[in-house]
């Protein structure tokens, strides 16, 4: 039985490479992914390596605030 409904939350992951390139206007946008995380198992910010279509390579995507 679940102890609470707010254990799993929806988070947005944003590419860290696109954020740095937007100053130089090299990329056309910012890549974002939507996923879930368990707040009890991972209380810190989530960072995953995902494919960025703007950079055209695998980059680190970090959790952002809503």
Swiss-Prot record:
Question: Where, subcellularly, is it found?
Answer: Plastid, Chloroplast
Q: Which GO terms describe its cellular component?
A: chloroplast; ribonucleoprotein complex; ribosome
The domain of life for this entry's organism is Eukaryota
**InterPro entries, per this entry?**
Ribosomal_bL33, Ribosomal_bL33_CS, Ribosomal_bL33_sf, Ribosomal_zn-bd
Signal sequence, start to end: none
Q: GO MF terms on file?
A: structural constituent of ribosome
Q: What is the similarity comment for this entry? A: Belongs to the bacterial ribosomal protein bL33 family.
Q: Which HAMAP family match?
A: Ribosomal_bL33
Name of the protein in question: Large ribosomal subunit protein bL33c
Question: Mind giving the lineage of the organism this protein is from?
Answer: Eukaryota, Viridiplantae, Streptophyta, Embryophyta, Tracheophyta
């Amino acid at each position: 039985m679940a102890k609470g409904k707010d254990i799993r939350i929806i988070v947005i992951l944003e590419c860290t490479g696109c954020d740095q390139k937007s100053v130089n206007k090299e990329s056309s946008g910012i890549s974002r992914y939507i996923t879930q995380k368990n707040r009890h198992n991972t209380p810190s910010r989530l960072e995953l390596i995902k494919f960025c279509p703007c950079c055209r390579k695998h980059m680190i995507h970090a959790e952002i605030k809503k």
